[in-house]
Amino acid sequence: MVKKNFIPSVSLVRRDLPTLVTTTTSSTALSKPTSSVVSETSSKSLPSLTSSAFSTSSGTTSSSSLIVASITPPSTVGNPFILNAADKPNGTVYIAVGAVIGAIFISILIWWLVSNYLSRRFTMTNSYANDSKNLYRGHHKHSSSLQSNPFDINDEKSYMQDDWDSMSQLESSQYEDAASPFNPIQDPFTDNRRSLFISPTLQVSQYEKSHSRHQSKDTNIFIDDPSLYVGTYLEEEEEEERKLNLNRPQRAASPERKEKKINSMEGYHKRNQSSLGLIPVASATSNTSSPKKAHKRQAPSMFLDDVLNGREII
């Protein structure tokens, strides 16, 4: 059997607005705990809807209750597990970390400033010491033997060596612009010379005269300077050796040149304006006074014949 949807016909009748009647029942306890909430029950009666049909509608009553818990933090008084931050500012951790980083940077800056200051001071002291040593080099007083000690003796030796070096440099600078001692162009007799012979002994004597003249001039210039007086026997010995080498030059004439007679030598010197042979040379006398003769070399065939004949022993 099939049921069909039956749609009844409803006719609406105009009427006035219904009146709403509400009844509220509330019960209140004398003592309520903190976590209890007043529950209210409300019941409402809805108006009934009447129609010309056979259907009716009725209202329902509903009741609801909500429980809300109140949260209160525990007290920090006497509790060792809770940090009492009431008397501390906000962001204490960030302040501490920033203070540590700032202290590290400040210490690095102080170390850099101190190291620069010390290095600059050390450099200035060294440069001042070197400048003062170069400025007052040689201007020192020689202490007596009673007041001297090994340290002072070593200092005096170093100062004397420095003075000698400075004097040698000064002397070399004085003679840098001077003419070379063995330059034949400076010979005043070159224009009047008829031969090509050059006398080195004459040039040596000229150099000796110019050297003595320059030396006397230097002594007159620096005679008032006490820093140039170096009282050492090494200086005197070197000066004597230098003078001996200039006074006794080696013979520069060729050994193959034949000896001439005295009369011919005098005419030769007058003609060529040369002093060769007039100055006694120690090396020449030593060579002429030696009685030994060089061994005569033999041909290989003659030496072999002497060996075969028994006149020569190997």
From Swiss-Prot:
It is found in: Vacuole membrane. Keywords: Membrane, Phosphoprotein, Transmembrane, Transmembrane helix, Vacuole. Its main location: membrane. Coiled coil: none annotated. Belongs to the PRM5 family. This is Vacuolar membrane protein SCY_4732. The modification Phosphoserine is found at residues 148, 254, 274. The chain crosses the membrane at residues 93-113. It comes from the Eukaryota. GO terms for cellular component: cellular bud neck; fungal-type vacuole; vacuolar membrane. It is a single-pass membrane protein. InterPro entries: PRM. Residues 254-269 have a biased composition (Basic and acidic residues). Residues 32-61, 240-309 are annotated as: Disordered.
